[in-house]
A protein has these predicted regions:
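Short, motif-level signal for alpha-helix interfacial/capping segments enriched in acidic residues
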Residues: 32-35, 135-136, 229
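Intrinsically disordered, low-complexity segments enriched in small/flexible residues
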Residues: 1-108, 276-314
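Terminal peptide-recognition signature
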Residues: 14, 55, 111, 158, ...
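Short hinge/gating elements
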Residues: 60-63, 124-128, 269-272
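Glycine-rich beta-alpha loop segments
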Residues: 91-93, 99, 104-156, 163, ...
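Conserved catalytic cores of soluble enzyme domains
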Residues: 157-287
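Structured core elements
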Residues: 61, 101-103, 108-112, 154-156, ...
């Protein structure tokens, strides 16, 4: 069953009418095909027009949709032969950040990403995708393995931000994020990062400092959440829609600013409407980018990353 967002109410009402009409016609000889087709056409057009005109705040809500595909969905349907690797060899294993060896379109890769979970139990287990220091140190370990074995790195970013708890700070959260970012920039192998949902602050940048950065059409990427920004600037989270607009959080804005390289289209109505199609589309896009990067030597890949981020800073 689809979980509707607030701005999708008109679509929800139409789809409910369609469902009621189908149920009422079951077992009857009444021909409702014409009316059903009319309503379905109207619903599809309304859904398309709604998603063509989403505001940055509405896109933020779509990026956070609970049914949106997560790391495990991409691993299951876009990658093959996944072998998970756990632990940072220092403190423990963080289930908010997962990774391991896999194959993408026949190519061996190391894949790393945030996992938010899809129900109450799994969300708690994965800490809602908020990585801890041991998670980022695990990512560093996997990136070092990728460099040692000459395997491309793929990262799937979906986090509201790194975990801000006291225990994480005590274990060196800031240092772990900085070291993970440094590891990305120093990789001697191709790296493609994809923002698949939320890309929140340093917790996202630590896995997205790649030479090619992709974003799903309705994903968001920002230095702080709209609510957090609004609370600082206006002392109220109710100004979150204004903050989202001002921060340029959408894939479309970030592509125009040169922060990301490619927007990956989503099914009409968002990735949560057709997760399998969304996953397949992104998998194809990542494989294409890896093909392009395969011709570069290690020193050229590092130079590409340096130029990318120096250009943004300048």
């Amino acid at each position: 069953m689809i979980s509707y967002l607030e701005f999708e109410k008109p679509v929800a009402e139409l789809e409910q009418r369609i469902a009621e009409l189908r149920n009422a016609a079951e077992g009857d000889d009444v021909d409702i095909s014409t009316e059903l087709q009319r309503l379905e056409t109207k619903s599809a057009a309304l859904l398309a027009s709604t998603y063509e005109a989403l505001t940055p705040w509405q896109k933020t809500q779509v990026a956070r949709h609970p049914s949106r595909p997560h790391f495990h969905d991409y691993i299951e349907h876009a990658f093959d032969e996944f072998v998970p690797l756990g632990g940072d060899r220092c403190y423990g294993d963080d289930e908010a950040i997962l990774g391991g060896f896999a194959k993408l379109d026949g190519r061996k890769v190391v894949v790393i990403g945030h996992e938010k979970g899809n129900d109450t139990a799994s969300r708690i287990r994965h800490n809602f995708g908020m990585g801890k220091p041991e998670g980022y140190r695990k990512a560093i370990r996997l990136m070092e393995l990728a460099g040692r074995f000459g395997l491309p790195v793929v990262t799937l970013v979906d986090t509201s931000g790194a975990f801000p708890g006291v225990e994480a700070e005590e274990r060196g959260q800031a240092e772990a994020i900085a070291r993970s970012t440094e590891a990305c920039l120093a990789l001697p192998v191709p790296m493609v990062a994809a923002i698949v949902g939320e890309g929140g602050s340093g917790g996202a940048v630590a896995l997205a400092s790649a030479e090619r950065v992709l974003m799903m059409e309705h994903a968001v990427y920002s230095v702080i959440s709209p609510e957090g920004c609004a609370s600082i600037l206006w002392r109220t989270a109710e100004k979150a829609p204004d903050a989202a607009e001002a921060m340029k959080v959408t894939a479309q804005d970030l592509a125009s600013l040169g922060v990301i390289d490619r927007i990956v289209p989503e099914p009409v109505g968002g990735a949560h409407r057709d997760p399998r199609l969304a996953v397949s589309t992104l998998g194809t896009a990542i494989a294409e980018e890896l093909d392009k990067l395969g011709r570069y030597a290690p020193h050229e890949l590092k130079r590409l990353r340096e130029e990318r981020f120096l250009t943004l800073a300048g």
